[in-house]
Regions:
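Aromatic/hydrophobic pocket-lining residues that form π-stacking "cages" and hydrophobic walls in ligand
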Residues: 1, 64, 113, 329, ...
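A conserved helix-loop-beta module that forms one wall/lid of the active-site cleft
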Residues: 1-25, 286-293, 345-353
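ATP-dependent carboxylate activation and anion-phosphoryl transfer catalytic cores
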Residues: 8-11, 21-23, 27-241
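Acidic, glycine-enriched active-site microenvironments
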Residues: 125, 133, 146-151, 155-164, ...
Length: 368
């Protein structure tokens, strides 16, 4: 396995040969980390095959739900993940229709989905998970069955896909059922996952290849930022409209974190950051207050959380396993019902939503 990992090149996705819900999956960034995980996890069951895949870092991920009668295939919905690839599809926030992909790429996705359904002779539902990196399309997996996104897609387009699929499997055709072309909803539909972290104090609060969510909510609006903000209000502590924001991100996220901090500052939020991130913010003209790391002294961010001095936390993990300090911060935030973003993509979408809510009319209802 170590030799194959060197051949494939890091980062890699390391997992048991058969898993459900991403159980036992790890994104591994170097050989030392891989050896540690293999010793701690896979040596428990010697002889169990281990699968290694090249991990496409910073790739966009897309879920496509289709229905086919064996002759005609219709796409029920295409959902773009808010987070980059690496977060389990059951945990990822998703936007329907896709919001950043080109029309050309979406057409490529459609044709690939039609071809897969035809070659696999699908009669019923099919889900395909794609990754897109550098304008190249990759197939992650194909499941000739109903996926967990079917209820969401059905509600978004107003078509009971599971009901249609059962009738198709009994011999009826899409033409007879009146569903012959893809429906693009006239609004944005955002799926956000609901997590049970407040029920399990001390559990790692981090999005990863292993699924942790126990439910989901839907945000609808004519504006994508507002739709995302609505989903956050329903799924977790609501996005704040004022206060101080603590930002601590890994090196790969710092460029985008600058734009996020600028956006929050323009909305009247105070910006808090550790020394390294704070220097970068100051260099870019952002007014920032430095906060001690947990190992550097006090007051640190946990002190501020306990004293209700923080209203939003943006904290992205470094590598596969969060450092102990990072986990303590996220755990304390959950205890105090503070909204926390653990991926830079989600943080960016949240800022967009806050910006629009600040300048728009009161939150409106969207009919489906």
């Amino acid at each position: 396995a170590y030799e194959r990992a060197e051949e494939i090149g890091f980062p890699i996705l390391l997992r048991p040969s058969f898993v459900l819900g991403g159980r036992g999956m790890f994104i591994v960034y170097d050989m030392d980390e891989m050896k540690k995980i293999v010793r701690e996890v896979f040596d428990v069951a010697p002889g169990t095959p281990v699968l290694l895949d090249k991990f496409l870092e910073d790739a966009y991920e897309l879920d496509v739900d289709c229905i086919s009668d064996g002759e005609r295939t219709v796409i029920g919905g295409m959902l773009q993940h808010v987070e980059f690839a690496g977060v389990h599809s059951g945990d990822a926030a998703m936007v329907m229709p896709p919001h950043t992909l080109s029309d050309e790429m979406l057409e490529t996705v459609r044709q690939a989905s039609y071809a897969l359904a035809k070659e696999l002779e699908v009669v019923g539902l099919m889900n395909v998970q794609y990754a897109i990196k550098d304008d190249e399309l990759y197939i992650i997996e194909v499941n000739p069955r109903a996926s967990r996104t079917i209820p969401f897609v059905s509600k978004a387009i107003g078509v009971p896909l599971a009901k249609l699929a059962s009738r198709i499997m009994a011999g009826e055709k899409l033409k007879d059922l009146g569903f012959t072309k893809e429906i693009i909803p006239p609004y944005w539909a955002v799926k956000e996952s609901v997590f049970p972290f407040n029920r399990f104090p001390g559990a790692p609060i981090m999005l990863s290849p292993e699924m942790r969510s126990t439910g989901e909510v839907m945000g609808l609006d004519k504006n994508i930022g507002v739709a995302f903000a609505k989903s956050q209000m329903a799924a977790k502590p609501a996005l704040p409209d004022s206060g101080d924001v603590f930002i601590s991100v890994k090196d790969a996220d710092k460029e985008r974190a600058v734009q996020i901090a600028k956006g929050l500052s323009a909305l009247g939020f105070g910006v808090l950051a550790t020394v390294g991130t704070g220097k970068l913010f100051k260099k870019n003209g952002i007014d920032v207050k430095n906060v001690c790391r947990l190992s550097e002294g006090r007051p640190n961010v946990i002190d501020l959380i306990k004293n209700n001095k923080v209203s939003l936390i943006i904290n992205t993990p470094q590598g596969t396993v969060p450092r102990q300090n990072e986990n303590e911060i996220r755990t304390e935030a959950m205890k105090h019902n503070i909204c926390i973003m653990t991926t830079i993509s989600a943080a960016s979408a949240a800022v967009d939503g806050l910006s629009l809510i600040h300048i728009s009319e009161p939150t409106r209802l969207t009919s489906i």
